[in-house]
Amino acid sequence: MLLFDFLDVIGFLGPYIVFVISVIQLYSYSYYLYGYLVIVAVSQIMNTTLKLIYKEPRPSGARSILGERYIGPEKYGMPSGHAQTIFTSIMYLYCVTGKLFWLYLEIFIACLTVFQRWKFNNHTPKQLFVGASLGAFIGYVGYLMNYYFIGDRYEMYMNEKNYLLE
């Protein structure tokens, strides 16, 4: 039982774990790191806004893992914030780095997260699916926006700066 309890905690903390992994992996890609921090904030704002628009309640009988209480917009379950956040991070990091090891590790953590949210009756499968799909979409669009609108300008700025220092 102890192993399953541990995996439940990993699942609950999954978005935070994947966030830390992403920040560490993106540290050497500075403009992608800044873009990531912005896109995660945008994803959170979108999640709260959608919860207030749809007002779809969480399933009855939800269990708490660490004593969390769901008040305000968090009392609504559509879309799942855990699923949305973790899949935003997964998609963005993979698009930037293309590293399969981190993709597989983060997908494993995402599976634990989605399962934990369902097992503890915090979300319906539909809420989890919508959160994961929306998160992957936000991560991909965020990557594209960063690549096309910021990346080229950042590279030109850095090349100019290096030229002036020579």
Question: Model-derived features: where do they sit?
Answer:
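Hydrophobic alpha-helical bundle signature of multipass membrane enzymes
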Residues: 1-78, 84-119, 140
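A cytosolic-side transmembrane-helix exit/cap motif
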Residues: 52-62, 123-131, 148-157
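Membrane-interface helix-loop junctions and terminal tails of multi-pass membrane proteins
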Residues: 66-70, 113-118, 122, 136, ...
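Alpha-helical transmembrane segments that form the membrane-embedded catalytic/substrate-binding core
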Residues: 82-86, 123-147
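Short, surface-exposed, charge-dense and proline/glycine-enriched linear segments
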Residues: 87-96, 132-138, 154-159
